[in-house]
Structures are given as C-alpha cells and as structure tokens.
C-alpha cells in the first residue's frame, strides 16, 4: 500500500506541474487518486511499450532514473523495473475499499468507467479482472453508429453516480464515429469539518490575487486549536484541518509572499511534501484561521497532458498495444475525461448537518494567525495511507 500511495502522490505533483504550464493565474483542481485508478484499469490491458510508458507516467516504475536514459536503455529499464502488476491492482482494491468505508462524515462518489467500441470486444479475463480489482465494468457501445447518443448516456450515468453534482462531463464534440475507447473519471466529495466555522463569523474581505490586484471573497473565520507546520524554503506556512473522524484532512500550503505560489509549486517534490506534512513536523497551536469560502469545478481533457508526460503510444492508433484487453488490432485510447467538484464552506466541503468534536488540551499553546488571503495550494489527504485524493490551487476567486 505504501508503494501505491507514493506512486499516486508522485503522479499528483508531476501532473500538477504539467497542468500549471498552461494554467497561469488559473485555479487547478483534480484527483490524482481518481486519475490513477482510472488509468490503472486501462494499464491492466496494455502490453509492451504502451504498458511501460503508462507505468512510467503513473509512477508504477520502481526505477524513476530511467527517464534520463537513452531511448533504448530507457525502454529496457521501463520494462523490467515496474512494480508487480498484481501487487499494484491488489493495493488499488484495498485503497478503494479503505476510502469507501471511511466514516459516514465523508462521502466520496466516483464515476469511473471505460467505454469501448463494440466491434472491439473485451477479453473475458480482462472484464473479470477489472471487476475484481476496481469494482468497475467496461462497457461495449456503438460509437460508430450512435456516437452522440452514447455521449448523452455517458453523461447521464456520470450525473447519477455523482448525485447530480457532475453534469455534462463529455462536451458536444467529445466523441464521434472514429472514437474507439474513452475513459471517464468524475468525483464528488462531501465532508464535515471536525471543527466547523460559525456562519455569523463569515464576512466579506479582500483576496490578493497578486501585489496589485484584489477581489472580494466571503472569508470564513475561526479560532481553534489546529496543527500547523512551517516551510523554510521557500518560506510558507501549512495547516491541517481534519474532517470528522479524522480519516481525511485538508492540508493548506500558504506562501509567505503574496506572489510566492509559483516558487512553491516549482520547489515542491514528493520527498519535500512528505517531510513538510509529517506528524513530527506538526505543531498544535491556537490558530486564528481566515479561509475563503469557494467552490471549484474543473474539467480536463487529459489526452494532451498525459501524452506530453510520456504516455503517447496509448493514444496512437498505429502504436497502441491493448492486446491484454482485446484481440482486435488498432484499438487505442481516444480520450480521457476527468472532472472534479469541491465546495469549501463553514460546515465542510459541502453544506451538511454535523457537529464538531472538541479536543481538550490542558496546556498553554502558541498563538498564531493563518490568513489565507492570497494564492495557496491545498490537498485532501487520506490519512491512513497519506494518499492525496484531491489536489488544488486556489488563486482566482
């Protein structure tokens, strides 16, 4: 399980940096866990270089140095240093079970499915394995003869799976008669804070987008005993907000400088994030916390991003090797669609009834102010595994 959580978190940071290249000044919100789980279903049916490339991008490769090797050596290393597939899939099965069995205080709804053109039938063994490890059932559909009808059916299924929170995942031109295989992944998260904000303390305040521009936001406020941590380079402060039952928590990384987010994003690595957010770096303080209310709904067509990260063969009709999935040649991944929804408010990540539990600490604690009034990074983390379920950047109200 440690290997999988590390893989997901490494993928989260690499993927976020790639997204940031074309999203300057924009909010980012995605689920590295969701993307990894959905792509792992595809990876289950790949072979050869297609499998090696996917393993590298998803951080399933045990030897990350291979990315710096010459092409011939890189291919050899990638093929022989991948973690055992059965171990990876078994860990996904365990992680999915862990997350879904989390306390009633948090609800995570996912819509995760592969849709393949019906003239490219799936192997029976592949269908069985996807159901065993991921609890999902790939669908054979008529892209050739009824592509738009299939698009509407996919959107309807996603909407139902996410309790109406994720609408129109696939836009009008998302599929056509040439589509061979589409992967959809949508997530909706709802949680209740351990310590809730009082609605009457929420007031309008300025959020500094940069040193010269501000926008008004509804700023929530609380004074509570919370865990904080400090980052020396680049200078930043972090804070952990638990959800009820403490299975999950929100981690916020706030640069000291209003314009410091770019430097923080460039500096962050898996090793540094693990160190910054480890239990022994946390300090319990009396915190005056100011945090904006916000709602993010982001949709990503992942084909270009994933291709640029190194898994181009899967999207190439002449190079893709999905022989573990189907006997038909020329099967390739046409697109990957991902959409996430989150709302941060006084009660939690979506308005819901709930009462916060009080932790009594009979000692004098340092008092600090944590004022999230300028761009910051945030993560929703599964605490038992330390896996990042959601990754976000809030910089534009």
From Swiss-Prot:
Mind listing the UniProt keywords for this protein, alphabetically?
Cytoplasm, Nucleus, Protease inhibitor, Serine protease inhibitor
Which Gene3D superfamilies does this chain map to?
A: Alpha-1-antitrypsin, domain 1, Antithrombin, subunit I, domain 2
Top-level taxon of the source organism? Eukaryota
Give a yes or no for keyword Metal-binding in this entry.
no
The subcellular location is: Nucleus; Cytoplasm
Q: Which Cys-Cys disulfides exist here?
A: none
Site annotation (Reactive bond) points to 362-363
The sequence motif named Nuclear localization signal is recorded at 74-77
* A GO CC term assigned to this protein in UniProt: extracellular space
**Gene Ontology molecular function: any one:** serine-type endopeptidase inhibitor activity
- Name residues in a coiled coil: none
Pfam families membership: Serpin
The main place the protein resides is nucleus
* Functional note: Protease inhibitor that may play a role in the regulation of protease activities during hematopoiesis and apoptosis induced by TNF. May regulate protease activities in the cytoplasm and in the nucleus.
Instruction: Identify its protein family.
Output: Belongs to the serpin family. Ov-serpin subfamily.
Q: What is this protein called?
A: Serpin B10
Q: Which organism is it from?
A: Bos taurus (Bovine)
Q: Which gene encodes it?
A: SERPINB10
